[in-house]
């Protein structure tokens, strides 16, 4: 597909590409989402939990009295690290040249095509920062590789042309205990560009609190000069070019989507679905559409009454593709779990690889991304279009 709107929908949520550099900040405390469950048997393989090791690392960094690390500590550590680098550079003036490879990516969670200049693209990696292209993706240049935080997770552009991006991930980790580890790191709030083309970005000082260190999703209102941010702390509405913020919902928010009329949808960390009502409040959908785990959302650009949900269970297994054709009043399960539709694989990576997108000109055609790639339409049903081989799990 070459249609710009579809590319924006699908590429902006893709979890399989990114950047190769890595900067991480220190969490203020050991998040509940990073705790690893008890040891479980998966077939003939037994996996050991690393919760003890994680606790040990955290305990060495915490305040002995409060048991936490204050956000200010992170800022101070960044300043000290920069000073050390400058001192070492002055003493040993070495010149480095990048030798490559330069075509290896990691994981992109933020993607944006400039609303007024289609050749200007932005891509944000969870460990490499924000990159910009003025050639429709043929070449890229880093924007923020010297800024405070390179954990870019979401990006949006308002109708006024201002571009905002958020940092820090909200604990994407397999909670079952059968796959140890977590890729999530805290961020440093929001950044914005007001030059009209996204050449430079500055930190928004009103987002330095811990509430803005885990920015999971961001969408701009299609008609009004405002945007919404979904964090581990809730949903925030930003107006006045980002200068004014209002919390409109609480809880862990994993994904936000907004339709062409400005109606906001959200999914929570526990699989609940929220929709904005006429008064601007977020209301929970019927419990029957709760998938139990991470859920991705897609709204048809053609018809906002058509909304799709692709869910993962609490263990990360595929729990189904659901659709409403009446704006959420009723729901139908289009695809159920089976050995054929197991799009998240035997590793149950629905907590990690989970994206769904609607074709911009066909509200009955959706693209489903997990470990594998599939489509669903009202004529052919579920069809797998690409997959990965299911290699044996290395327990060593």
Role assignments for model-derived ranges:
Residues 3-396:
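Extracellular glycan-interacting surfaces
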């Amino acid at each position: 597909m070459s249609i710009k709107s579809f590319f924006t929908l699908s590429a902006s949520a893709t979890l399989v590409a990114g950047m190769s550099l890595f900067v991480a900040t220190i969490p203020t405390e050991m998040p509940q989402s990073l705790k690893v469950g008890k040891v479980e048997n998966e077939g003939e393989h037994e996996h050991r939990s690393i919760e003890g090791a994680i606790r040990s690392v955290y305990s060495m960094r915490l305040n002995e009295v409060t048991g936490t690390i204050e956000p200010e500590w992170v800022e101070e550590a960044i300043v000290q690290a920069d000073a050390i680098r400058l001192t070492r550079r002055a003493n040993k003036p070495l010149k480095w040249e990048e030798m490559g490879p330069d075509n290896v990516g990691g994981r992109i969670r933020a993607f944006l095509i400039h609303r007024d200049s289609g050749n200007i693209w932005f891509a944000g990696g969870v460990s490499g920062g924000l990159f910009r292209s003025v050639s429709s993706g043929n070449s890229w240049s880093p924007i923020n590789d010297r800024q405070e935080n390179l954990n870019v997770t979401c990006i949006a552009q308002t109708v006024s042309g201002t571009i905002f991006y958020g940092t820090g991930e909200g604990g994407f980790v397999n909670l079952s205990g059968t796959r140890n580890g977590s890729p999530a790191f805290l961020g440093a709030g929001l950044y914005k560009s007001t030059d009209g083309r996204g050449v430079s970005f500055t930190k928004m000082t009103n987002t330095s609190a811990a509430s803005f260190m885990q920015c999971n999703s961001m969408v701009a209102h299609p008609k009004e000069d405002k945007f919404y941010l979904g964090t581990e702390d809730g949903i925030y509405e930003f107006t006045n070019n980002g200068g004014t913020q209002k919390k409109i919902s609480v809880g862990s928010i994993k994904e936000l989507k907004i339709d062409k009329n400005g109606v906001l949808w959200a999914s929570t960390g526990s699989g609940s679905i929220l929709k904005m009502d006429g008064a601007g409040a977020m209301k929970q959908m019927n419990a029957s559409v709760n998938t139990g785990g991470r859920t991705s959302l897609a709204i048809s650009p053609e018809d906002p009454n058509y909304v799709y949900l692709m869910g993962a269970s609490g263990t990360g297994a595929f729990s189904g593709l659901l659709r409403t054709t009446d704006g959420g009043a009723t729901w139908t399960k289009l695809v159920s779990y089976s050995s054929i539709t197991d799009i998240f694989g035997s590793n149950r990576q629905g907590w990690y690889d989970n994206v769904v997108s609607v074709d911009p000109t066909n509200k009955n055609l959706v693209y489903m991304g997990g470990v594998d790639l599939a489509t669903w339409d009202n004529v052919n049903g579920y069809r797998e279009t690409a997959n990965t081989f299911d290699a044996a799990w290395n327990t060593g």
